[in-house]
Amino acid sequence: TPQGHYTLAPLYDVMSAYPVLGEGPGKLSPHRARLAMAVRGKQAHWRMRDILRRHWIGLAERHGVIGMNNESAADIIDTLAVRTPTVIENIRNRLPPGFPHPVADSILQGLQRAADRLLQQH
């Protein structure tokens, strides 16, 4: 935080949730998936489906996040979302032999859907 305090990031939940999201036995409905930690803007948002671009921007602004060249939180989010396909490609190329493809696919496809959603909410 700007006051020098540490807070945990809610993003660690995302990777662990994607492999089990879905419908049917042994799966977690995407409509019910909740983060262990809320994304906090003006209010706390726990459900993954309810967290919108504006909530991330509010969180960043609340904590004084600016880019290295004074980019706004919205600009940083746009840059991250636009670069996501390249990052996914690089990750796929670096996966160790034998890494379970269903796990990688669910995480990386979920990441791309999240990036697309951020860009659509412009």
Task: Describe each region flagged by the PLM.
Residues 1-122:
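Anionic ligand-binding catalytic core segments
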